[in-house]
């Protein structure tokens, strides 16, 4: 009986630990993601990229290779999975 209780306690502890997120890593979705990103970029002194930056390249096929990260990837990295502030800042 004591062995079953010890096994149950050990399994519940393992399950609880596996569901915990590391410190500094959170999930950001929707408005919370947009506001957090806007605040972080503003505090870092980074302005939002404008379309004028892409026009200077002259070729539409170069747009995906411009500096910075793509806009679609942030949802994959920070909404579907937890991400850190450093990952968010890389999208500024």
UniProtKB/Swiss-Prot annotation:
Keywords, ordered alphabetically: Cleavage on pair of basic residues, Disulfide bond, Hormone, Pyrrolidone carboxylic acid, Secreted, Signal
Gene Ontology MF terms: growth factor activity; hormone activity
Signal peptide: 1-19
Disulfide cysteine pairs (residue numbers): 29-79, 41-92, 78-83
Cellular location(s): Secreted
Modification Pyrrolidone carboxylic acid occurs at: 20
Proregion span(s): 50-70
Subunit structure: Heterodimer of a B chain and an A chain linked by two disulfide bonds.
Function: Brain peptide responsible for activation of prothoracic glands to produce ecdysone in insects.
The protein's name: Bombyxin A-3
Top-level taxonomy: Eukaryota, Metazoa, Ecdysozoa, Arthropoda, Hexapoda
Record gene name: BBXA3
